Swiss-Prot record:
It is found in: Cell membrane. This is UPF0391 membrane protein GOX0352. Pfam families: DUF1328. Disulfide bonds: none annotated. InterPro entries: DUF1328. Belongs to the UPF0391 family. It is a multi-pass membrane protein. The chain crosses the membrane at residues 5-25, 33-53. Keywords: Cell membrane, Membrane, Transmembrane, Transmembrane helix. GO terms for cellular component: plasma membrane.
């Protein structure tokens, strides 16, 4: 489960870099949305891993 948290965290960082660096105005909104979604998924995966829930 911690593996998923790390993957989601890395994806959120990549999406944040693209969304907040001003690469393209058209993709910035999508990247910001992905940043929020994957950041939430990373937090949930970390909490599930800490709590010992392996059935997500």
């Amino acid at each position: 489960m911690l593996h998923y948290a790390i993957v989601f965290f890395i994806i959120s960082i990549i999406a944040g870099v693209f969304g907040f660096s001003g690469i393209s105005a058209a993709t910035a909104g999508i990247a910001k949305l992905f940043f929020i979604v994957f950041l939430v998924l990373a937090v949930l995966a970390i909490l599930a891993g800490v709590a010992g829930l392996h059935a997500l």
